Amino acid sequence: MLEKGEKMKVFISWSGEPSRKAAVVLQEWLPSVIQAVDPFVSSESIRTGSRWFTEMGTKLKDTNFGILCLTPSNLEAPWILFEAGALSKQLEESLLTSVLFGGLSKGDLECPLSQFQNILPHKEDIRKLISTINEHLADEKQLSDAQLTTYFDKWWPELEEKIKDITVAVESETKSKGVKLKRDPEEVMEEILELSRNTVRQLD
């Protein structure tokens, strides 16, 4: 729980242009729903500057909540892995969330990315993310369930439209780079079961 009057510092990690757009969109949108958050997105200037390690280290140290914007193209990106590793060392698992764009599933992730709570950029998953952030605010900063629902329902349509654009950009990037996803084990098992059922029907 945060100290009285303290805003929650949310570190949003990205790598690649579609992921950066997603991070910036979340940075701008989150305070519309929960005013007691202070989202941070690292800029290209920080990443390429001579003092990047010191500056990033300070931001990561002060972070209360971490969000990764993951796409099929950035799962092995050095920046994502560095920031994910630093966040996972500092924060408990419930305070770490990955937003999976471009058809990603948990089966596509390896450590440290697999340590995060994984959500899709869908309405109910984003609602759960907002609810989790709200639960970890200082008591006097927390919104009631009714307030949270009101603010979320008001601002969700704006985010939804931007997510559609991001999804198109992610799919275009994935296609241009020839990235292929792992198949979800559950999906493979379902396919095997369906094939087995069809075989049994043919034998009957």
Describe each region flagged by the PLM:
Residues 2-28, 104-204:
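C-terminal interaction surface of TIR/SEFIR-family domains
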Residues 8, 35-37, 61-66, 91-97, ...:
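Short glycine-/polar-rich loops that comprise or flank the Walker A/P-loop
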Residues 12-15, 43, 70-72:
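Short glycine-centered, acidic/aromatic-flanked micro-motifs in structured strand/loop junctions
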Residues 21, 51, 79-82, 187:
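Short, well-structured alpha-helical interface segments that form or flank functional binding sites
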Residues 25-29, 55, 59-62, 82-86, ...:
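Alpha-helical scaffold elements adjacent to nucleotide-binding pockets in ATP/GTP-utilizing enzyme cores
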Residues 26-57, 73-80:
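Conserved BB-loop
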Residues 62-104:
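Amphipathic helical hotspot of TIR/SEFIR-family domains
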